[in-house]
Amino acid sequence: NGINLRTDPVEAKKYIGFLPQRPPLYPELSVDEYLTYCARLRLMDAREIRQAVDTAEAKCGITHFKKRLIGNLSGGYQQRVGIAQAIVHNPRFVVLDEPTNGLDPVQIVEVRHLIKEIAAERAVMLSTHILSEVQATCDKIKMIEHGHMIFSGTMEEFNNYVEPCSFLVTFGNP
């Protein structure tokens, strides 16, 4: 966008959404209260907050939990609330750090689907150490090792890149 994060961080952060590995949730707040609080932290216009919260809740499939306390939600729904706070201000770029960490298999599939929906509308960067997460969610991959990019390409190119490093382990019957 041409905005320098170092010289104009407040303006630049308007275009960035972030979900840390452990979402910064307040269990004593309702989903609505929390997302409204996050929108205010993002310096959103007060007249736009209600609509922005409703839109984020709908996108993340948590509309029916808007009045529930976050502490009473399952891990999967808490993660959805975390994702909602990352998109409530409608950023152009969203960073998700280990978004399926600690979720059960059904919740993982649901959150992956949600990530793909969000990625259809804006740029999403997924930070993860789980290869299956990358394969199930990403179109383009950049691999960083010790602060240096060691791979950049498509999923197909990535599969060819890691194939020589892979091996298959099989177990026979005892």
Residue ranges of model-derived segments:
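ABC transporter nucleotide-binding domains
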Residues: 1-145, 150-151
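Short, charged/small-residue-rich alpha-helical element at the C-terminal edge
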Residues: 165-174
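Short acidic-hydrophobic catalytic motif
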Residues: 156-160
